[in-house]
Amino acid sequence: MVPVLLLLPALAGLFGAAEGQAFHLGKCPHPPVQENFDVNKYLGKWYEIEKIPVSFEKGSCIQANYSLKENGNVEVINKELRADGTVNQIEGEATPENITEPAKLAVKFFWFMPSAPYWVLATDYENYALVYSCTTIIWLFHMDHVWILGRNPYLPPETVTYLKDILTSNNIEVEKMTITDQVNCPESM
């Protein structure tokens, strides 16, 4: 018990340092994912509309492009426009996490890092997608990541509300979500 008590102040400091990120007591929730998910319909370019802020995304004009690799996995290319006008890009690979639930993927960007969950909670493939990721930290806390994506840089407010309602109905907080700036983005991205 004493080691846990010593660990709590350190974790509190860590959580305070991760401004905007969503840390919560307890293990990750397990919301239902998109039924009959078809990865082939999901491929292509998506624009980030809103998200729970994450330390690894600081820019604007954030977008993701998904394509099928020869091995059957999904190539992930994420891009953002930095404040200095340069484009930051990262490439990763998504693999099925559970063959019976194809909307549950695991994405990995660096060989030395563990994979992270990438769960598609909802999509109509042509307009919107709702993506959820959660990591449990030493059985005491969990950290949420949420992305609302669109095939176009903007979604109607009623669509965003619909997607946020899915989150809140599954006890996933949306209060920290922020709108991603998609104004004056270079076409070359």
From Swiss-Prot:
GO cellular component: cytoplasm; cytosolic ribosome; dendrite; extracellular space; neuronal cell body; perinuclear region of cytoplasm
Signal peptide residue numbers: 1-20
Post-translational modification Pyrrolidone carboxylic acid, affected residues: Q21
Keywords: Disulfide bond, Glycoprotein, Lipid-binding, Pyrrolidone carboxylic acid, Secreted, Signal, Transport
Keyword match Iron: no
Disulfide bond positions: C28-C134, C61-C185
Compartments, record wording: Secreted
Protein name (database record): Apolipoprotein D
GO molecular function: cholesterol binding
Family the entry assigns: Belongs to the calycin superfamily. Lipocalin family.
Superkingdom to which the source organism belongs: Eukaryota
Record function comment: APOD occurs in the macromolecular complex with lecithin-transport and binding of bilin. Appears to be able to transport a variety of ligands in a number of different contexts.
GO biological process: brain development; glucose metabolic process; lipid metabolic process; lipid transport; negative regulation of cytokine production involved in inflammatory response; negative regulation of focal adhesion assembly; negative regulation of lipoprotein lipid oxidation; negative regulation of monocyte chemotactic protein-1 production
Subunit structure: Homodimer.
InterPro entries reported for this sequence: ApoD_vertbrte, ApolipopD, Calycin, Lipocalin_ApoD, Lipocalin_CS, Lipocln_cytosolic_FA-bd_dom
Glycosylation sites noted in the Swiss-Prot or TrEMBL record: N65, N98
